[in-house]
Curated annotation (Swiss-Prot):
Name used for this protein in its record: Elongation factor Ts, mitochondrial
Primary localization: mitochondrion
Function: Associates with the EF-Tu.GDP complex and induces the exchange of GDP to GTP. It remains bound to the aminoacyl-tRNA.EF-Tu.GTP complex up to the GTP hydrolysis stage on the ribosome.
Gene Ontology CC terms: mitochondrion
Record's subcellular location: Mitochondrion
InterPro entries cross-referenced by the UniProt entry: EF-Ts_dimer_sf, Transl_elong_EFTs/EF1B, Transl_elong_EFTs/EF1B_dimer, Transl_elong_Ts_CS, UBA-like_sf
Family stated for the protein in its record: Belongs to the EF-Ts family.
Gene from which this protein is expressed: tsfm
Record-linked PANTHER family: ELONGATION FACTOR TS, ELONGATION FACTOR TS, MITOCHONDRIAL
């Protein structure tokens, strides 16, 4: 009996000691656990990747957040290229037109995806902005003067550098990996005009979200010359709205006679903002003339591709 009591006493002390050590261990390990959690939250916020992948990155990089972020981007790029290859045959007819103006220059791009849901995603819209910025930067390196119009294909754009360093092709693959849809940089046009020329622009079906760029389902640019009575901005916007609504396919001449509703030449068409006049008549009133125009509709077939 005495032996049994002694055994119970010893056992109680052992259990108490183990519990004390366990509690002390928990308290001493809490600071490091908190630090890991803080790093995890920081990495998740800065990259947008899943908690699982962020945790894996921190473990692989010994909690070095800079290395972990680089590792995540590299893995995402690899996975994006792999996914892009698998998805490239799928139809991508949704997306956005991006339009950017700067001084006497303008850029309009079309980036396609599979669904309207992805087109409204912030990461997709950031890609559209990056493509427009890259095309604008590429255009600014030209040493040509006067009126410059450049049409870029998907292949042309893939060779450009993205604003933050990597190629646009890598940026595209990264976005495909994140969003899981086929995405394509379809086409772009850049314009640069002399100081006495002007560019009018219009975006229809506007989508808000990014600063410094207009986005929507349709976009138009009009190059014109003159000092209109109503001001260059007002006339430029009206002309671009007309091009958007009437979809002309050629410019025509100032003295062309209209063929009515079936007219596809810009100048003889009835002027959409003021139907009392043809486009040519309205330009004459404003002492201006149109030199060129471009119209993009998201998902349309195009001879410019």
């Amino acid at each position: 009996m005495a032996m049994y009591s002694l055994f119970r006493s010893v056992r109680s002390e052992v259990v108490k000691g183990c519990l004390t050590q366990h509690v002390q261990s928990l308290f001493t390990s809490c600071p490091s656990l908190a630090a890991d959690k803080a790093l995890l939250l920081q990495l998740r916020k800065s990259t947008g990747y899943t908690f699982v992948n962020c945790k894996k990155a921190l473990e692989k990089c010994n909690n070095d957040i800079t290395q972990a972020e680089s590792w995540l981007h590299e893995q995402a790029k690899k996975e994006g290229w792999s996914k892009a290859t698998k998805l490239e045959g799928r139809k991508a007819k949704e997306g956005l037109i991006g339009l950017m103006m700067h001084d006497n220059a303008a850029v309009m791009v079309e980036v396609n995806c599979e669904t309207d849901f992805v087109a409204r995603n912030e990461k997709f819209q950031q890609l559209v902005k990056d493509v427009a910025l890259s095309v604008m930067a590429h255009q600014s390196t030209s040493k040509k003067t006067g009126f410059i119009k450049s049409v870029l294909s998907s292949e042309d754009m893939s060779k450009l550098n993205a604003p933050d360093g990597p190629s646009l092709a890598d940026q595209l693959a990264l976005t495909i990996g994140r969003l899981g849809e086929n995405i394509a940089m379809r086409r772009a046009v850049s314009l640069s005009v002399p100081s006495d020329w002007h560019i009018g622009s219009y975006i229809h079906g506007t989508v808000a979200g990014q600063v410094g760029i207009e986005m929507g389902r349709y976009g138009s640019l009009v190059v014109f010359q003159g000092e209109p009575k109503e001001g260059t901005y007002a006339l430029g916007r009206k002309l671009a709205q007309h091009v958007m609504g009437e979809a002309p396919v050629s410019l025509g001449n100032m003295d062309d006679l209209s063929c009515g509703d079936s007219e596809t030449r810009l100048l003889p068409q009835t002027f959409l903002p003021d139907p009392k006049y043809t486009v040519a008549q309205y330009l004459t009133l404003q002492d201006a003339r149109v030199l060129d125009f471009i119209r993009f509709q998201c998902g349309e077939s195009s001879s410019q591709e």
